[in-house]
């Protein structure tokens, strides 16, 4: 079977606090080829990595206690965000972990030779913020993949980051596949489908993988799979769908992909 590229979702989030430098560093050191992360922007225009709009789910006061009020990252300067701890919620051993700057993750990725998948939360930013984000990526020459859920998003990426790959995470029929392929070719386009319903209960039924769906995608794009509960499920999905890439929270290791 072909080798499947593994990407670490928010770093190795099953073993480390998600979207932190320690989690990203672990992903690189464990041999994942790509790291998925969530971009946000602070009140003073600093690009940071955080899944939610609010910091409360993964941030704590320095003593480990919950933050008393809900705080939007867009209402905080980066200096204000640094007052909170982003590791202790996961385990006391990660006390002191801070909210990472995106530019520091770019530096780490360059040092470790891994690429970055930028989640489609990028498109929740204002246009001028996105353009500044693209400028930062261009200035560093980083190897990035941008996650898109609409053709308009994909067109924007192609115009402003013409070397970047696109990860299409939305529903995609054959006509859209053909249009995307005409712009990006197969090498710059990956279409993602979930595997297990229990891990993506919110997803539309017709989004899930099937041999027929995989066969329709693969002539036009690389195939990515996600929502994979176990190594056995991963190997079965590889047998059925012949994916090019898979996303994991850390339960599937690079050595498992080598065996697929």
What residue ranges belong to the model's regions?
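Phosphate-group recognition and catalysis centered on beta-loop-alpha active-site segments
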Residues: 1-260
């Amino acid at each position: 079977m072909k080798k499947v590229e593994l990407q670490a979702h928010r770093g190795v989030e099953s073993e480390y606090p998600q979207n932190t430098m320690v989690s990203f560093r672990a992903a690189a050191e464990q041999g994942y080829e790509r790291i998925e992360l969530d971009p946000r922007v602070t009140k003073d225009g600093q690009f940071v990595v955080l899944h939610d709009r609010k910091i409360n789910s993964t941030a704590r006061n320095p003593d480990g206690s919950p933050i008393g009020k809900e705080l939007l990252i867009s209402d905080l300067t980066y200096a204000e965000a640094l007052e909170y701890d982003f590791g202790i919620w996961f385990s006391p051993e990660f006390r002191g972990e801070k909210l990472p700057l995106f530019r520091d993750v770019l530096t780490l990725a360059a040092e470790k030779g891994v690429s970055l998948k930028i989640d489609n939360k990028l498109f929740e930013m204002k246009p001028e913020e996105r353009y500044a984000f693209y400028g930062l990526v261009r200035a560093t020459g980083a190897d990035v993949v941008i996650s898109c859920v609409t053709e308009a998003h994909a067109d924007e990426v192609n115009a402003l980051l013409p070397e970047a790959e696109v990860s299409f995470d939305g529903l995609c029929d054959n006509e859209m596949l053909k249009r995307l392929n005409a712009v990006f070719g197969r090498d710059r386009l990956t279409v993602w489908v979930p595997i297990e319903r229990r891990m993506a209960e919110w997803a539309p039924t017709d989004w899930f993988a099937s041999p027929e769906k995989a066969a329709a995608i693969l002539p036009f794009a690389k195939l990515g799979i996600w929502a994979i509960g176990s190594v056995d499920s991963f190997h079965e999905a590889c047998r059925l769908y012949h994916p090019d890439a898979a996303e994991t929270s850390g339960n599937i290791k690079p050595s498992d992909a080598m065996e697929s």
